[in-house]
Amino acid sequence: MKKIVVIPGDGIGKEVMEAAMLILEKLDLPFEYSYYDAGDEALEKYGKALPDETLEACRKSDAVLFGAAGETAADVIVRLRRELGTFANVRPAKAIEGIECLYPGLDIVVVRENTECLYMGFEFGFGDVTEAIRVITREASERIARYAFELAKREGRKKVTALHKANVMKKTCGLFRDVCREVAKDYPEIQYNDYYIDAACMYLVMDPFRFDVIVTTNMFGDIVSDLAAGLVGGLGLAPSANVGERTAIFEPVHGAAFDIAGKGIANPTAMILTACMMLRHFGYVEEAKKVEEAVEKTIKEGKKTPDLGGNLKTMEFANEVASLLD
């Protein structure tokens, strides 16, 4: 029995989580769900955006399924990533038939190192001068590179591309690039190459089909994964996972969207696909495929939420997907 902590959070997080839970409960898998608070409402209610009770439950869980948070998002999700040691942020960018996008048929994955780089928060100010310390270690670089190659191997993908800026940041990016090249030697069946981050952004816009799995450092990965999402329809359709040695956090990329919260029109696609990533994580690959195919079939038939030009409400869309799982 897998213990899943469910955190709906703020805004549309509650609505899209309800949709995803409808799908998960329909599958009737050996999961034990427990609901906890985190986010803006939790801050107002408990004085903490991430209450101690929630954090403790997350530490004991096999996975966390997270909806969305508002202004306190960084206090919740960034801290959770750190506390749970989720070193890999996995962000697929896959075009869905029936949704207009720049590159139909595109299917790539961005694997982002989640624990170091400039996002460690080592920033200092001296009058009119500020500075930040960038930390890149061999251990974290090897761990994320190996994760990217193992993901490629597991999913039958053929290529891993590392992104860096070693021509300028010779020590930090140089170490990351060199470690990726070393790890690549252990996977001769998988193609490897690397690009400077600026050139890679150009290639992503002009010819994204040259990529398959992208692995990169924390800040570059944050930026490039949003770019990749834009190629296939935007952040509203993008799922993600934060994976550690012992547990994982699964969250849609979109935020709380307070402007549409409570109207019942939020698109739950990203949240449902995020739940599918959790299913795959636990080895329920066929179940995940079944849900993904149901989502794609629903959208292809023109049954969409308003943001995609349709007229279905959040739970109406979820029910359409669920009906295909019978």
From Swiss-Prot:
Q: Does the keyword NAD apply?
A: yes
Instruction: Mention any one GO cellular component term assigned to this protein in its UniProt record.
Output: cytoplasm
Entry keyword Cytoplasm:
yes
Q: According to its UniProt record, which protein family does this protein belong to?
A: Belongs to the isocitrate and isopropylmalate dehydrogenases family.
The note on the cofactor says:
Binds 1 Mg(2+) or Mn(2+) ion per subunit.
Gene name per UniProt: leuB
GO MF terms on file? 3-isopropylmalate dehydrogenase activity; isocitrate dehydrogenase (NAD+) activity; magnesium ion binding; NAD binding
Return the protein name.
Answer: 3-isopropylmalate dehydrogenase
Assembly, per entry: Homotetramer.
